[in-house]
Amino acid sequence: MKTPKALAVVALVALTVPAAAQDWDCDDAGNLPQQGMNWCAYQDWQRADRALNAAWPLVVDAMNAADAFAAESFPEQANGHDSLLKAQRAWITYRDGQCTAEGARFAGGSLRPLIENFCKAALTRKRTEELLLMLEEG
Protein backbone atom coordinates (compact mmCIF):
# COMPACT_ATOMS: atom_id res chain seq x y z
CA MET A 1 0.00 0.00 0.00
CA LYS A 2 1.40 3.39 -0.97
CA THR A 3 -0.19 5.39 1.82
CA PRO A 4 2.51 4.74 4.49
CA LYS A 5 5.21 5.59 1.95
CA ALA A 6 3.41 8.81 1.00
CA LEU A 7 3.02 9.70 4.68
CA ALA A 8 6.72 9.11 5.23
CA VAL A 9 7.58 11.44 2.36
CA VAL A 10 5.21 14.11 3.69
CA ALA A 11 6.73 13.77 7.17
CA LEU A 12 10.24 14.05 5.77
CA VAL A 13 9.33 17.16 3.81
CA ALA A 14 7.63 18.65 6.88
CA LEU A 15 10.83 18.16 8.87
CA THR A 16 12.88 20.04 6.30
CA VAL A 17 10.49 23.01 5.98
CA PRO A 18 11.48 24.72 9.25
CA ALA A 19 15.13 24.67 8.20
CA ALA A 20 14.28 26.14 4.81
CA ALA A 21 11.98 28.74 6.30
CA GLN A 22 14.43 29.95 8.92
CA ASP A 23 14.44 33.59 9.86
CA TRP A 24 17.25 35.25 8.00
CA ASP A 25 18.83 38.43 9.35
CA CYS A 26 17.81 40.78 6.57
CA ASP A 27 19.68 43.66 8.19
CA ASP A 28 22.82 41.79 7.16
CA ALA A 29 21.52 40.53 3.81
CA GLY A 30 24.87 41.08 2.09
CA ASN A 31 26.36 38.28 4.18
CA LEU A 32 23.57 35.81 3.56
CA PRO A 33 23.57 32.92 1.13
CA GLN A 34 21.55 33.46 -2.04
CA GLN A 35 18.53 31.70 -0.57
CA GLY A 36 18.55 34.13 2.35
CA MET A 37 18.92 37.17 0.11
CA ASN A 38 16.01 35.95 -2.02
CA TRP A 39 13.89 35.43 1.10
CA CYS A 40 14.72 38.92 2.39
CA ALA A 41 13.87 40.50 -0.97
CA TYR A 42 10.54 38.68 -0.96
CA GLN A 43 9.82 39.85 2.60
CA ASP A 44 10.66 43.41 1.58
CA TRP A 45 8.18 43.20 -1.30
CA GLN A 46 5.53 41.79 1.04
CA ARG A 47 6.02 44.70 3.47
CA ALA A 48 5.71 47.16 0.60
CA ASP A 49 2.58 45.37 -0.63
CA ARG A 50 0.98 45.50 2.83
CA ALA A 51 1.64 49.26 2.96
CA LEU A 52 0.03 49.69 -0.46
CA ASN A 53 -2.96 47.61 0.63
CA ALA A 54 -3.32 49.77 3.73
CA ALA A 55 -3.28 52.96 1.64
CA TRP A 56 -5.70 51.67 -0.99
CA PRO A 57 -8.98 51.94 0.98
CA LEU A 58 -8.08 55.46 2.10
CA VAL A 59 -7.61 56.55 -1.50
CA VAL A 60 -10.77 54.74 -2.61
CA ASP A 61 -12.77 56.49 0.13
CA ALA A 62 -11.35 59.86 -0.89
CA MET A 63 -12.13 59.17 -4.53
CA ASN A 64 -15.68 58.11 -3.69
CA ALA A 65 -16.14 61.34 -1.72
CA ALA A 66 -14.81 63.36 -4.66
CA ASP A 67 -17.18 61.51 -6.99
CA ALA A 68 -20.12 62.25 -4.70
CA PHE A 69 -19.20 65.93 -4.64
CA ALA A 70 -18.75 66.04 -8.43
CA ALA A 71 -22.03 64.23 -9.03
CA GLU A 72 -23.96 67.19 -7.62
CA SER A 73 -22.75 69.71 -10.19
CA PHE A 74 -20.65 67.81 -12.73
CA PRO A 75 -22.06 64.29 -13.02
CA GLU A 76 -20.06 63.59 -16.17
CA GLN A 77 -16.89 64.08 -14.09
CA ALA A 78 -17.88 61.71 -11.30
CA ASN A 79 -15.66 58.93 -12.59
CA GLY A 80 -12.69 59.09 -10.22
CA HIS A 81 -13.28 55.70 -8.62
CA ASP A 82 -13.56 53.94 -11.97
CA SER A 83 -10.47 55.73 -13.26
CA LEU A 84 -8.51 54.84 -10.12
CA LEU A 85 -9.47 51.18 -10.39
CA LYS A 86 -8.54 51.09 -14.08
CA ALA A 87 -5.20 52.76 -13.34
CA GLN A 88 -4.43 50.35 -10.50
CA ARG A 89 -5.15 47.32 -12.65
CA ALA A 90 -2.92 48.73 -15.40
CA TRP A 91 -0.21 49.47 -12.83
CA ILE A 92 -0.27 45.87 -11.55
CA THR A 93 0.14 44.62 -15.12
CA TYR A 94 3.00 47.08 -15.64
CA ARG A 95 4.72 46.15 -12.35
CA ASP A 96 4.56 42.44 -13.01
CA GLY A 97 5.72 42.78 -16.62
CA GLN A 98 8.53 45.19 -15.78
CA CYS A 99 9.86 43.06 -12.96
CA THR A 100 9.62 39.86 -14.99
CA ALA A 101 11.58 41.60 -17.75
CA GLU A 102 14.24 42.72 -15.28
CA GLY A 103 14.50 39.21 -13.88
CA ALA A 104 14.64 37.61 -17.33
CA ARG A 105 18.27 38.63 -17.65
CA PHE A 106 18.95 36.03 -14.96
CA ALA A 107 16.70 33.25 -16.31
CA GLY A 108 17.46 29.89 -14.78
CA GLY A 109 19.61 31.40 -12.07
CA SER A 110 19.11 31.82 -8.35
CA LEU A 111 19.48 35.59 -8.72
CA ARG A 112 16.23 35.97 -10.67
CA PRO A 113 13.87 35.97 -7.63
CA LEU A 114 16.09 38.53 -5.91
CA ILE A 115 15.96 40.91 -8.88
CA GLU A 116 12.23 40.46 -9.43
CA ASN A 117 11.37 40.98 -5.76
CA PHE A 118 13.63 44.03 -5.45
CA CYS A 119 11.87 45.46 -8.48
CA LYS A 120 8.40 44.69 -7.12
CA ALA A 121 9.26 46.22 -3.75
CA ALA A 122 10.63 49.41 -5.32
CA LEU A 123 7.72 49.88 -7.73
CA THR A 124 5.18 49.07 -5.01
CA ARG A 125 6.69 51.65 -2.65
CA LYS A 126 6.63 54.23 -5.43
CA ARG A 127 2.98 53.43 -6.22
CA THR A 128 2.06 53.73 -2.54
CA GLU A 129 3.64 57.19 -2.49
CA GLU A 130 1.65 58.14 -5.60
CA LEU A 131 -1.59 56.97 -4.01
CA LEU A 132 -0.92 58.80 -0.75
CA LEU A 133 -0.10 61.94 -2.70
CA MET A 134 -3.62 61.79 -4.12
CA LEU A 135 -4.92 62.21 -0.57
CA GLU A 136 -2.91 65.42 -0.14
CA GLU A 137 -4.01 66.92 -3.43
CA GLY A 138 -7.71 66.31 -2.80
Give residue ranges: language-model regions:
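Bacterial N-terminal signal peptides that target proteins for export
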Residues: 1-8
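N-terminal alpha-helical modules
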Residues: 20-138
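N-terminal signal peptide c-region/cleavage motif recognized by signal peptidases
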Residues: 16-18
